[in-house]
Design a protein with these regions (language model features):
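Terminal transmembrane helical anchor/hairpin motif
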Residues: 2-4, 18, 29-30, 63-86, ...
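Aromatic- and glycine-rich beta-strand/loop motifs that create alpha-glucan
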Residues: 2-58
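Secretory targeting signals
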Residues: 24-25, 50, 54-109, 134-199, ...
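Membrane-helix boundary and inter-helical linker elements of multi-pass secondary transporters
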Residues: 46, 125, 197-198
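Transmembrane alpha-helical segments in integral membrane proteins
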Residues: 99-115, 192-203, 260-276
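Short helix-to-coil transition segments within interhelical loops
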Residues: 123-129
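Functionally important transmembrane alpha-helices
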Residues: 187-219
């Protein structure tokens, strides 16, 4: 007879919980997302200033849409157009210039701090650059989401104040446009972080982003078909700021695929640039 093997812990010895897939996934989430985010939030300098400025710009752009509707109320009523006026007029400049500029300032501030005292190269010596970059990308993503949600809620509030009846379909449409715009904003965030990694000057990084944003406006006016490909036009495309049309499943799929390609390319280039700082 073979004696049974006792796997119980000896008396007086602590029993440790069994690790499994759930614990492993939780630890990976903490290591790859939560920890880098917490570190970058701690390092971030007075983020409330830019957040307040973003809210003020969202208010101004929404007010622009409200005044546009009030100026041509009879015409819009005859056409049966309501909240779309507030959204379209407010989102045009918001998505083309103001949100890309806000993301530019946020990304430039996050990358500039690492150029001080050659922190990028110092972190590269112990393999912390990718973790740091991940935290900055997540933090910029959350900032873009905050900006978009602020604009969305302000348009809803303004529409309600004007007496518009927002149906569930209207709310779903606005939310979809805002989220698609957020996805497009991530493309800009990734691009600006890449610029910030290469360029140590805060002013140069910001001017690059502002120039790219104005070029987006020019492309939108002169060659609208090219705006679907231009990275800094993706917020405008996602928010349907010009067309105010319900996107088809095919157009949404193309938008998501193209922005995923752009983001993947810029993230890979950023990681490559950070690895080169080890040498």
């Amino acid at each position: 007879m073979t004696a049974a093997i006792n796997t119980a812990a000896p008396a007086g010895m602590p029993e440790f919980p069994q690790t499994g897939p759930t614990i492993t996934r939780t630890s990976r989430l903490r290591e790859r997302v939560l920890l880098p985010l917490a570190i970058e939030r701690t390092k971030s300098r007075r983020p409330w200033i830019l957040a307040t400025f973003a809210l003020a710009l969202a208010v101004l752009n929404t007010a622009n849409g409200v005044f546009r509707y009030l100026g041509y109320t009879k015409i819009f009523r005859d056409q049966g157009v309501t909240w779309q006026v507030v959204w379209g007029q407010g989102a045009l400049m918001w998505s083309t210039l103001f949100l890309p500029m806000l993301i530019t300032f946020r990304a430039a501030g996050l990358t500039r701090m690492e150029h001080e005292h050659d922190n990028w190269r110092r972190m590269a010596t112990y393999g912390a650059t990718i973790t740091t970059y991940t935290g900055k990308l997540i933090l910029t993503t959350l900032f873009a989401l905050y900006c978009q949600m602020a604009f969305l809620l302000l348009v809803m509030a303004a529409s309600a104040a004007l007496g518009f009846h927002l149906t569930p379909a209207d709310i779903a449409t606005m939310t979809t446009w805002a989220l698609l715009g957020t996805f497009g904003a991530l493309t800009i965030a990734a691009a600006q972080l890449l610029v910030g990694i290469y360029v140590p000057s805060f002013a140069t990084t910001v001017l690059t982003g502002i120039g790219a944003s104005f070029l987006s406006l020019a492309v939108l006016l002169v060659a609208p078909p090219l705006s679907t490909l231009y990275p800094y036009s993706q917020v405008t495309i996602g928010m349907q700021a010009r067309s105010l049309a319900t996107p088809t499943p095919a157009s949404i799929a193309w938008f998501l695929i193209w922005n995923t390609i752009l983001m993947t390319a810029t993230v890979l280039l950023s990681r490559r640039a950070l690895r080169r700082k080890q040498h």
